[in-house]
Each structure stands twice: as C-alpha cells, then as structure tokens.
Amino acid sequence: MIIDSYDINSEPIVKLENFYGEKQHLVKKCMVIFSKVIYEYMLEKFPCRQIAEVRACNGNIPVWSLPYEEETIAFYLTPIGSALAAGTIAEVNHLTGASVFIMFGSCGSLDKEATDGKFILPTEAYRGEGLSYYFAEPQDYIKIKNTDKLAEFFKERKLPYVQGRVWTTDSMLRETVNLVNKRKEEGCIAVEMELAGVQAICDFY
C-alpha cells in the first residue's frame, strides 16, 4: 500500500548528483511561479538572467534570477501537480542552493464565505496525492510551516487573508460530492494540487 512507501532505512538508487554533479550555492530564495502571465511579466520588467536549467525529455525548465533591493532571487515557471512541482523544487534546490521557496497560485474554494476576496494561507494540507508518502510518515494531513509568519506579514500590511486547512488532490475530476463534503467537515476551505507533496519534500530535504 502507498502508506508503506516511506523508507529512510535504505539509500535511493537515483540521486540528483548523478545528473547535475555537485550541489551549487547561487541563491538563497526562489519564487515558484504557476502563472505564465506573472512569469512573462517578470522576465519583461526585471533584468533577469538564466542561472540553471531543470532538464527533462519533454522540455527543460529554465531557472532565472533577478536583483531585488540587495538580494538576488531566483524564479521559474513550475509544472502543475504534486509530483512534478515538488520534484522540480528538489532539483532547483540542488542546482541553485535555494533553501527558501515562496510558492503561490490559484485554487478552488470549498468555503466561499470564508475565502471570498481573501488570500488563503494554508495551515495543513490533506494528503490526497501520492508523492508525500515517499517523503513523510503516513498520516492524513501535513502541517504547513511558516503559515503564522505569513499571517503576520499579511496582517502588518493590512492584506485580507484567511488561514485554514486545504485539500491536495491528484485529480480534480474525482472531487466527488461525498469527498468534498468530507474534506469540508474536516475544516478544509480550499482544494489545490501541489501543497502536500511540496511541503513533504521541503521538510525531507
């Protein structure tokens, strides 16, 4: 069963250094971009330069950097879905040394009254995907680190936000009435497709 997939007692057969060589240390922070519009805006408006590339047989993902105040921040356009988004973060970490990843994107609301007109800051993610079970011990939810730090940031700037559980799923086509109701009963206010896996891989590394 998938809940038996967490194995820290033996070494992985495939390692990133086999493909990319030694880990690099180029930047500390990296933005994970889902929106092609935002991605293209950043490339157009900032003096960006390519610092790395995630390689894949169906197309490579360039990783860019831009200067912001006295920092250099990396960013890239991420693939969608838990396995790809989380795996890409692991590769970007290896290629650039980035250890602080800022990820934001869209989602589906499960509670319009709570979320309408607000930024959603997840506190926990239901693990309705597969990747997280390889990187974290099996349990229904995974805690989202730094959610309270983000809430303080939003509060100081008087930005509308709400905190709550979210549901990470691998298939929006199987968000059935019964499953939606069950997640809502557990306190989920939104549904998306990446967070549980991304948090698990970040915690692991």
Residues of each region from the PLM?
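A C-terminal functional module that forms or caps the active site or interfaces directly
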Residues: 178-182, 189-205
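Short, conserved beta-strand edge motifs with alternating hydrophobic and charged residues
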Residues: 103, 122, 162-169, 192
